Amino acid sequence: FCWHYNLFGLSVLVMLTLLGLLIAGYLKLNVGRTPVSAAEKWSVDIPFSVYLGWISVATVANVTDYLYFINWAGFGLAPQAWAVVMLVVACLLGLLMTVTRRDSGYVFVLVWSFAGIAQKQSAAALVANSAWVATLFMLGLAIYSMVERNRAGNGREVK
């Protein structure tokens, strides 16, 4: 709502609030660490992880729009350099979710998002190439996450 009416500052506050609430719920549910049934995994954990991933990406997009709206100078760094910095930060989040939670749902959202960035920014070689590298890195992490979870006997799942 806020974003559609160019209320970018308010939109950022709404998104940060939603992101904070989702993180609190994610931690409370202990996604990736507590054994759950297959039904709960597919109806709660995976959708929650995917939604948290999308809201994480959307929050970055909203902050980016807000900074553009207020003509932020970026501490002298070019917008393309900031895009690469944000890709690195997002990759670190994906790595954190893989190492601490083996959460492939969250990481697959990053794969999709980075591929979209690479495609949309194809004219900006630095951004596009960095996004493709990030896409491949996240895809590798997602696959690693699934393999490790299965190697552990899918230890989260309760029969």
Model-derived segments and spans:
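Internal transmembrane alpha-helix with an interfacial aromatic "cap," most often the third helix
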Residues: F1-A38
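Membrane-interface helix caps and helix-loop-helix hairpins in membrane proteins
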Residues: F1-L13, I70-L77, V99-T100, Q121-L126
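Alpha-helical transmembrane segments of multi-pass integral membrane proteins
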Residues: V14-L27, V44-N62
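Alpha-helical transmembrane segments and their membrane-interface exit regions
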Residues: T17-L27, F114-I117, L136-Y144
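Membrane-interface capping segments at transmembrane-helix boundaries
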Residues: L27-R33, I143-V158
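A loop-to-helix transmembrane entry motif
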Residues: V44-G53, W72-M86
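Membrane-interface transmembrane-helix boundary segments in multi-pass integral membrane proteins
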Residues: G76-L92, A118-G140
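Central hydrophobic cores of alpha-helical transmembrane segments
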Residues: G105-I117
